[in-house]
């Protein structure tokens, strides 16, 4: 039996039950996949840092049949390239109305909102929370987002939050390396 890592959030029984029926995980990018930092070079190019550890977690979810996507206001070519490399099922970059995008995904994929989780870190993500069945926030999220979230992760965006949520979701479904730790 694998012990539950002390540095990861352990959901309450009610949240664990809701996580166990999820069919889709949708995520914001800046502040979730990244720490929100945008680097600029002398020639004006932008750069963002993504974690391969987070990417591996996404791969684990996809292998388990979970729909994975991003809904982000930031319209960044770097972000699009990274999400395409991860072969996400839904890529919505430059989304000005996150709730509308979420409702569209739910309808097109014939999902019930209770089957969808959203992880966001800042005030614009609260609209997406209104559509999601499970609302998740990284440790570094805005206080209002943490207060609204059903689950607040121990890891911060850009520093393992995505991997943590992937492992927690899989464990709640009885899958993945942490399944026996619940």
Write out the residue ranges for each language-model feature.
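Asp-based phosphoryl-transfer active-site loop
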Residues: 19-38, 129, 162
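Substrate-recognition element of Asp-dependent hydrolases with the DxDx(T/V) motif
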Residues: 58-82, 129
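Non-catalytic pre-domain segments flanking phosphatase-related domains
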Residues: 1-27, 175-182
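Basic, amphipathic juxtamembrane/active-site segments
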Residues: 37-59
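Mg2+-dependent phosphoryl-transfer enzymes with acidic/Ser/Thr/Gly-rich catalytic loops
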Residues: 44-51, 78, 84-86, 90-92, ...
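Short coil/turn segments at beta-strand junctions that form active-site/ligand-binding loops
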Residues: 21-23, 66, 114-115
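Short, flexible loop segments at the rims of nucleotide/cofactor-binding pockets, characterized by
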Residues: 3-4, 9, 45-48, 69, ...
